[in-house]
């Protein structure tokens, strides 16, 4: 049973993941129907993002409002943090304003775990450094479950900058707990050392990873990595690891294509592949709202 906070997929049991997904499907029914509920009336959700985010922050805002909660967002660029206030003081200040749930994103791994120790409010990790992005993995797993049903024996290929991807880490933790087989592929300079210890198979070309896959997941390449020399050029990355229609034909005939967004089109994924019938990238966005509604509901009810 999910406790006070959601800090990472690594901390969750298989049963906890499935509990969240089951409720997320119920929340999606609400989204597709009446849309608005008063389930969290009187509750307050606050987002504090120390890194840029449009999708995740807006998704949490919509999730809170659809459930009838009050919502607030702290703009870090104009907040007291810029004036020297510590992270812990900021979190305590927000708690004193009677926030029930605080969603935070920070470029330093482990920040949500630290903050959770200093507040009675529930902390949701909206992404911490290169460590984890649990809500993205949950919406990805929801999308896979929706399309494929069972995870046991499912073959998933994750392609891109594995080393710097918190999305990859959270997905690997979750997919392995649910019984999927995971392959990862990317340039050797973007592959973490000893990642095999997470139970994945490492491939150094896209074709090997995609062959016979049920799910193909591209990761966003941060273009600044190329400037720092971690891979030679965008063109070379696209040639060897870009997901296109030809490579997707190596996957199973009913395979699905995923991407956490935003996509660098014609770098990680071609427009042809992203717009194809097997692409579920837009459905991931809707499922993101449903998953975050489920998490807010679970954590607020635990607080009661």
From Swiss-Prot:
Binding site for carbamoyl phosphate: 55-56, 105, 133, 136, 261-262
Source domain of life: Bacteria
Keyword tags: Pyrimidine biosynthesis, Transferase
Reaction catalyzed: carbamoyl phosphate + L-aspartate = N-carbamoyl-L-aspartate + phosphate + H(+)
Segments passing through the bilayer: none
Top-level enzyme category: transferase
Example GO molecular function: aspartate carbamoyltransferase activity
Gene Ontology CC: one annotated term: cytosol
EC number: 2.1.3.2
Metabolic or biological pathway: Pyrimidine metabolism; UMP biosynthesis via de novo pathway; (S)-dihydroorotate from bicarbonate: step 2/3
Binding-site residues for L-aspartate, renumbered to this chain: 83, 166, 220
Disulfide-bonded cysteines: none
GO biological process, one term: 'de novo' UMP biosynthetic process
UniProt record similarity statement: Belongs to the aspartate/ornithine carbamoyltransferase superfamily. ATCase family.
Function: Catalyzes the condensation of carbamoyl phosphate and aspartate to form carbamoyl aspartate and inorganic phosphate, the committed step in the de novo pyrimidine nucleotide biosynthesis pathway.
Subunit structure: Heterododecamer (2C3:3R2) of six catalytic PyrB chains organized as two trimers (C3), and six regulatory PyrI chains organized as three dimers (R2).
PANTHER family linked to this entry: ASPARTATE CARBAMOYLTRANSFERASE (PTHR45753:SF6), ORNITHINE CARBAMOYLTRANSFERASE, MITOCHONDRIAL (PTHR45753)
Protein name as it appears in the record: Aspartate carbamoyltransferase catalytic subunit
Species name: Caldanaerobacter subterraneus subsp. tengcongensis (strain DSM 15242 / JCM 11007 / NBRC 100824 / MB4)
Species classification: Bacteria, Bacillati, Bacillota, Clostridia, Thermoanaerobacterales
Gene name tied to this protein: pyrB
């Amino acid at each position: 049973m999910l406790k006070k906070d959601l800090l990472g997929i690594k901390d969750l049991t298989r049963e906890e993941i499935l509990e969240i997904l089951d409720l997320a499907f119920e929340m999606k029914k609400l989204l597709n129907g009446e849309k608005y509920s008063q389930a969290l009336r009187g509750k307050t959700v606050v987002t504090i993002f120390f890194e840029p985010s449009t999708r995740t922050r807006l998704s949490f805002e919509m999730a809170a409002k659809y459930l009838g909660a009050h919502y607030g967002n702290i703009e870090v660029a104009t907040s007291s943090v810029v004036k020297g206030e510590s992270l812990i003081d900021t979190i305590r200040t927000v708690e004193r304003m009677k926030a029930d749930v605080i969603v935070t994103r920070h470029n330093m791994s482990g920040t949500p775990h630290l903050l959770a120790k200093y507040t009675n409010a529930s902390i949701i990790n909206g992404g911490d450094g290169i460590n984890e992005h649990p809500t993205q993995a949950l919406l990805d797993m929801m999308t896979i479950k929706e399309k494929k049903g069972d995870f046991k024996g499912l073959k998933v290929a994750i392609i891109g900058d594995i080393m710097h991807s918190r999305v990859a880490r959270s997905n690997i933790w979750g997919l392995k707990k649910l019984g999927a087989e995971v392959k990862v592929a990317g340039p050797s300079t973007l592959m973490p050392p000893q990642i095999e210890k997470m139970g994945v198979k490492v491939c150094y070309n896209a074709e090997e990873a995609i062959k016979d896959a049920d799910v193909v997941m591209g990761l966003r390449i941060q273009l600044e990595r190329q400037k720092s020399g971690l891979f030679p050029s965008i063109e070379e990355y696209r040639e060897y690891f870009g997901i296109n229609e030809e490579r997707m034909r190596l996957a199973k005939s009913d395979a699905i294509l995923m991407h956490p967004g935003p996509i660098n089109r014609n770098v990680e994924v071609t427009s042809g592949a992203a717009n194809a019938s097997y692409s579920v990238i837009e459905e991931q966005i809707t499922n993101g709202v449903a998953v975050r509604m489920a998490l807010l509901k679970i954590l607020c009810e635990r607080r009661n």
